[in-house]
Design a protein with these regions (language model features):
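Short acidic catalytic loops
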Residues: 80
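Nucleotide-sugar donor-binding catalytic core of glycosyltransferases
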Residues: 1-75, 83-93, 108-238, 246-259
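A short helix->loop->beta-strand "cap" motif at the edges of active sites that frequently abuts
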Residues: 99-104, 131, 243-245
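Conserved acidic donor-binding segment of nucleotide-sugar-dependent glycosyltransferases
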Residues: 264-269
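Glycine-centered loop/turn motifs
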Residues: 77, 262-263
């Protein structure tokens, strides 16, 4: 890609290691397309956005002017990448304002069934709007006829601490796996293993990725508990691989990867 890349709501740390030349072509935008906080904006957006044609000035009601204007500065040859875009009407309203010749991508880094109520129907609608869709999960890619884009990881430049301070490390939102995580933690501690489990209630309460990697590096083993019906790799197996850590995972699909080693990877079946 020779033009600019406008990235919406993606984790910034993934792109921080790019060369200055590539960084100059990236425009980072926060998740300004997310659900409004006030009841009035929630109701009016549900009733109007994407259902009738609305000019940009009206869309400012729901989407912050600064960021919408930035995204719509894209020109032919540029590209837009939206993480987890799932509201069909919002994507429809935005797409109608994007100049022709701008490629629009959406990347799903969570299982599709956790993102959509009607996955097949909604994904087809989004594709018909002109968005190119991809997912981290190979089964979802096959099931919904979208592109598969494997998991990614950027190895940081920071030094790795020498001595681990815990045996097992997990950090992530509970989602639908809190009972499984609690049971595993109790099992590990019963077997005299020290656990460092960080489970914030919301994403805003979580630690930074730099701190996350520091905590991971201070542990001997990484815990990887996937959501139900997930086959795509999370970033944890890659982090364990690059940091030379053991891994406990419930993702059976990991055994098909060439880096799988049964001596250091424990599958919870």
């Amino acid at each position: 890609m020779k033009g600019k890349l406008y990235i919406v709501s993606a984790p910034r740390f993934i792109f921080d290691g790019l060369t200055p030349g590539r960084q100059e072509r990236i425009v980072y935008l926060p998740d300004f397309l997310s659900f409004p906080k006030t009841r009035f904006k929630q109701l009016t957006r549900a009733l109007l956005v994407g259902r009738i044609h609305l000019p940009k000035k009206i869309l400012y009601t729901w989407f912050q002017k600064e960021y919408l204007d930035q995204m719509l500065q894209a020109k032919a040859g540029d590209a837009i990448l939206i993480y987890e875009g799932c509201n069909v009407n919002v994507l429809k309203a935005i797409r109608s304002l994007i100049p022709s010749g701008v490629t629009c991508h959406i990347y799903y880094c969570n299982p599709i069934h956790t993102t959509f109520k009607n996955p097949s129907e909604d994904l087809k609608k989004i594709q018909r709007l002109g968005y190119e869709l991809s997912t981290f999960d190979p089964k979802d890619a096959e099931r919904y006829n979208i592109k598969f884009a494997n998991q990614y990881f950027r190895y940081p430049a920071e030094d790795i601490p020498e001595e681990p301070t815990s045996d097992c490390f997990f950090c992530g939102l509970a989602k639908n796996r809190i009972h499984e995580l609690q049971a595993l933690k109790e099992l590990l501690e019963t077997n005299a293993l020290t656990c460092n489990f960080i489970i914030p209630e919301t994403a805003k309460e979580g630690i930074s990725y730099a701190e996350y990697l520091k905590q991971l590096s201070l542990s001997r083993c990484v815990i990887d508990i996937n959501q139900s019906n997930q086959t795509g790799l999370t970033r944890r197996p890659l982090e364990a691989l690059f940091y030379n850590k053991k891994l406990i995972t419930n993702n059976a699909d990991i055994r098909r990867y060439n880096f799988y080693n049964q001596k250091i990877y424990l599958f919870l079946g």
